Amino acid sequence: MTAVRISTGIRASRNQAIVDIKISLCHLSSMELMLTQLRACAEPTRLRLLALMALGDFCVVELTDILGQSQPRLSRHLRLLVEAGLLERTREGSNAWFSLAQTGLGRDLPAKLPAIDATLQADRRQAERVLAERARAATERFRRDGAEWDEMRALGLPAETVEAALVADVETLSLPEGATLLDIGTGTGRILELLAPFIGSGLGIDASRTMLALARSRLSRARLRHCSVRQADMMRLPLPDASFDLTILHMVLHHSETPGAVITEAARMLKPGGTLLIVDLAAHERQDLTRALHHRWPGFSDAEMRRALTSAGLQAIPAATISGPIDIAIWRAIRPAGTTPAAFTLKAASIHD
C-alpha cells in the first residue's frame, strides 16, 4: 500500500489545507483509508471526542470545558481527526465548530463505543450541562437582540398548516436513500427538525450567529446528529455545485434584496434531478405589514416566481396555495437531469424586474 501524507504544511491557508486533506483522502484505497482512520482514532482522548460529537456540534472552548484538557492539546487531537476524515470543521467568526463526518467510519464508530464506560458517561453528563448552558445563552441573546418574535404568528399565518403542507409535498418526492438537504436561511432550524426523518443528512445555512445558536440547541435537544448548521451568505454559498438532492427556501425570499439571485444560487446546489422547494408569501397589498416587519418584497406572484425559476435553469411545477390573512405559496422546481451549473444564468437579479 502507498503511504500518503495527509498533513499539508504550515504555509497553506486553513481553507486550502482542508481542500488538500479532502483531495488526499480521495486518493486512498478503501483499505488505506480505513487504516488511516483507525490510526487516527486509536487514542483515548480522540475516542472521547468522537463519542461527544454523537451528541451534536461543539466548538473548542466547549470541548475544553467538557474534557478538562488544554486548548492546544485538544486542538491537536481535533486536527488529526479532521485530517483523517472522521470529523468535519467549519469556521464561524472566531470559533471553529466540529461535527462528525456524515459518511463512513466517522459516522458509524461512536455507536460502537461502550455506552456503559464510566469515562464516556461522565463526558456525556458534562456535555449535557454545556448544551443546556448553550441553550440558555442562545435564548437570552435572542431576547436581548429583540428578535424573539415568530414571523408566521405576527402575520397571523397558520404555521402548523404550512408545515403539514411542506411535509406532504416532501413525501411525494422520490428522494434517494440517504438524501441530502440544504435549508437556506435556516433560522432556528425548525425545517431541519421537521424534515429530518426524510433525509440522510441535512445542512442549515444562516448569516445570524444568534439564529445558529438557537438552531444548534434545537438539533441537540432532538438528537439529530445527521443535521448541522453553518454560517454563510446565501448569495455566496461556500459549497460545491450539485451537492444536494433537496434545497429549501422557507420564508426567506421576501427579505432578500435580490431574490432571483438567491434562487439561482440555490439551483446551483442541486444535483441533476434534485428539487427546490420555496415557501413564501404570495403577492399581497398589505403595505402595513410589509413596513412593520421590514419585508423587502410584498410577496411574489406565480408568474414572477416561475420566471425566476426558469431563469435559474429549473423546471417549475404549479404552486400550491395555503389560504390565510396573507396567502402562502409552495413552489416546486426540478433541476433537469443532464444539466450542469454552467447552464444556469445569473441574469435574474430580482424577481420583480
What is the predicted function of each stretch?
Residues 180-182, 188-236:
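Class I SAM-dependent methyltransferase SAM/SAH-binding core
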Residues 235-246:
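A short acidic, Gly/Pro-enriched loop at the edge of an enzyme's catalytic core
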Residues 275-332:
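C-terminal alpha-helical "lid/dimerization" subdomain adjacent to the S-adenosyl-L-methionine
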Residues 157-177:
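Conserved alpha-helix/loop element of class I SAM-dependent methyltransferases that forms part
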Residues 260-275:
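A short glycine-rich, Lys/Arg-flanked "PGG" loop and its adjoining helix->strand segment in the class I
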Residues 16-21, 25-30, 105-153:
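Amphipathic alpha-helical dimerization/coiled-coil segments
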Residues 32-72, 96-103, 165-167:
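N-terminal helix-turn-helix DNA-binding core of bacterial DNA-binding proteins
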Residues 1-34, 353:
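Short, intrinsically disordered or compositionally biased N-terminal tails of bacterial proteins
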